[in-house]
A protein has these predicted regions:
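Bacterial N-terminal signal peptides
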Residues: 2-11
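A Zn2+-metalloprotease active-site environment signal
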Residues: 12-319
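Short, low-complexity, intrinsically disordered N-terminal peptides in bacterial proteins
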Residues: 1-2, 319
Length: 319
């Protein structure tokens, strides 16, 4: 069974991408694991700014699988097992391990229940503030009871998108990067930057803003003529600049090296040299403008970090 569902998402640009199915028989699993390893701390770091789209998390994912009986089990059948555990979040701290089989959740037996249903059960208990989450798991031929305490995180689904393009997406509910981007980045810090930028778009409600602006521009275009459309590229560049600013803070709060932002954009500029990218050129800030803005943002972050101040962006000036 797949770990992540197959569907289609609209990207920040006009492109659409197919989301990669991750099951243990495909070569995409290492990419998916790396993607979630990098993304989870960013979602936690941004939690203060997505109060509407916030939910507690433990840092693990589940899957369905056919299993042999564990000690005290009933025989061969279907069980829910742990498909992923983030090394820095509560599930790992409690001792949950990849491949552990779930027996019960807060003393409710989950044998024979699908992973999707178990995940919903965990979410309901967490939203109801039933803490800690108590998991009974089959582990190495025996049983073990683990207590997990949740941490707050943004409720954005993280997706890996099939495309050779170097791109990311944010639609208000999801964030994702392409397989081309995964191959392009040279470090987890560079990948963190791509994800932090997309998370910032969601935190700042840019997809909703873009929809409202599109409706307004369509109305103005119908009543005043096509000249109203000339403001669209400027508006989109402004959204990108704001996402750069807040994204740098998200990245810093998650503990990633924000100097990687400059390295990323310099390599992107080198890659784009000589290429015809009219949509990107019109709707995104130039690399020179981005690097100049980053220098100001990085200085601002460091001035707060040195005396131990909280890394809070000036949201009023970025919305």
């Amino acid at each position: 069974m797949p770990l992540w569902l197959l569907c289609l998402l609209a990207a920040c640009s006009s492109h659409q991408y197919e989301i990669i199915r991750g099951d243990e028989s495909t070569s995409s699993v290492p990419m998916l694991v790396r993607l979630h390893d990098v993304a989870f701390p960013l979602l936690v770091a941004a939690a203060d700014w997505c109060s509407v789209d916030q939910e507690p998390t433990y840092g693990f994912l589940l899957k369905d699988e056919e299993t042999l009986p564990i000690q005290g089990g009933e025989g061969v059948g279907k069980r829910v097992s742990v498909a992923y555990v983030h090394p820095r979040l509560p599930a790992a701290s409690a001792g949950l391990m990849l491949g552990d089989q779930l027996i019960s959740v807060n003393e409710r037996t989950v044998t024979g229940i699908r992973a999707e249903e178990v995940s919903l059960l965990v979410r309901r208990m967490t939203v109801a503030r039933i803490q800690p989450l108590q998991l009974e798991v089959g582990h190495r031929g025996g049983r073990q009871i683990l207590n997990l305490w949740a941490v707050a995180a943004c409720q954005f689904s993280v997706q890996l998108l099939e495309s050779n393009q170097i791109n990311g997406i944010a639609d208000g509910r999801h964030v994702g990067v392409t397989t081309g981007a995964m191959r392009f980045v040279r470090s987890d810090d560079e990948l963190a930057w791509m994800l932090a930028h997309e998370i910032a778009h969601n935190v700042l409600s840019h997809s909703q803003d873009a929809q409202l602006r599109a409706m307004l521009n369509a109305f103005l275009g119908a009543t005043m003529g096509a000249s109203s459309e000339t403001s669209v590229p400027f508006q989109r560049r402004s959204l990108e600049t704001r996402a750069d600013y807040v994204g740098a803070y998200i990245m810093a709060r998650a503990g990633y090296d924000i100097q990687a932002i400059k390295q990323f954009w310099r390599r992107m500029e080198s890659l784009r040299s000589g290429e015809n990218t009219p949509e990107m050129d019109v709707t995104h800030p130039t690399t020179a403008d981005r690097l100049a803005a980053f220098e100001i943002t990085l200085k601002e972050i460091q001035e707060k970090r040195d005396p131990g101040e909280s890394l809070q962006p000036v949201l009023e000036s970025t919305q």
